[in-house]
């Protein structure tokens, strides 16, 4: 049976577009262990939790961002399936916008750094092709949906 994890692709919008005309920045966290990979906040489902509850709990634990500080974007949910540590893994992501552009990030010990990044930079740091594709799909979804 595959390991199951859930998370949120957290983003914020600039009020004024940057020089490259982008307004969306994604939050990526750098793991403290292993290859120090960059991903959105995510974690394993605990017994009795549903997937979205897991995503919100993991976000709170890993970033300090509470559910009340986020808006979950309707209509976007992605399931990634891959092998991690020789075991099949399923990760489900939703898009979530921070309500406060300057929200404080408080990292857990699981992560050593965070960055807010435009799509191109986020895809460069996200080493896994499935994560890059999910970020691109999320960006495209946001750009085709009124803010």
Swiss-Prot record:
Cofactor remark: Divalent metal ions.
Sites of N-acetylalanine modification: 2
Gene Ontology molecular-function annotations: bis(5'-nucleosyl)-tetraphosphatase (asymmetrical) activity; GTP binding
Keywords assigned: Acetylation, GTP-binding, Hydrolase, Nucleotide-binding
Entry keyword annotation includes Magnesium: no
Segments carrying motif Nudix box: 43-64
Keyword Chaperone: no
Reactions that this protein is recorded to catalyse: P(1),P(4)-bis(5'-guanosyl) tetraphosphate + H2O = GMP + GTP + 2 H(+); a 5'-end CoA-ribonucleoside in mRNA + H2O = a 5'-end phospho-adenosine-phospho-ribonucleoside in mRNA + (R)-4'-phosphopantetheine + 2 H(+); a 5'-end FAD-phospho-ribonucleoside in mRNA + H2O = a 5'-end phospho-adenosine-phospho-ribonucleoside in mRNA + FMN + 2 H(+)
Cofactor(s) the protein requires to work: a divalent metal cation
Ranges of residues in domain Nudix hydrolase: 2-139
Family membership noted in the UniProt record: Belongs to the Nudix hydrolase family.
PANTHER family according to UniProt: BIS(5'-NUCLEOSYL)-TETRAPHOSPHATASE [ASYMMETRICAL], DIADENOSINE 5,5-P1,P4-TETRAPHOSPHATE PYROPHOSPHOHYDROLASE MUTT
Protein name: Bis(5'-nucleosyl)-tetraphosphatase [asymmetrical]
Organism: Mus musculus (Mouse)
Gene field: Nudt2
């Amino acid at each position: 049976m595959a390991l199951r994890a859930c998370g949120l692709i957290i983003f914020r919008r600039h009020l004024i577009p940057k020089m490259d005309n982008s307004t969306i920045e994604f939050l990526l966290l750098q793991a403290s262990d292993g290859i120090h990979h960059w991903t959105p906040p995510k974690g394993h489902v605990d017994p009795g939790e549903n997937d979205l509850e897991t995503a919100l709990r993991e976000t709170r634990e890993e970033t300090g961002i509470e559910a009340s500080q986020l808006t979950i974007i309707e209509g976007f949910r992605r399931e990634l399936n891959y092998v991690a540590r020789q075991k099949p893994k399923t990760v489900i992501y939703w898009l979530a916008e921070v309500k406060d552009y300057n929200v404080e990030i408080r990292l857990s010990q699981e992560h050593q750094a965070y960055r807010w990044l435009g799509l191109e930079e986020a895809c460069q740091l996200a080493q896994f092709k499935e994560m890059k594709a999910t970020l691109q799909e999320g960006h495209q979804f946001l750009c085709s949906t009124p803010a």
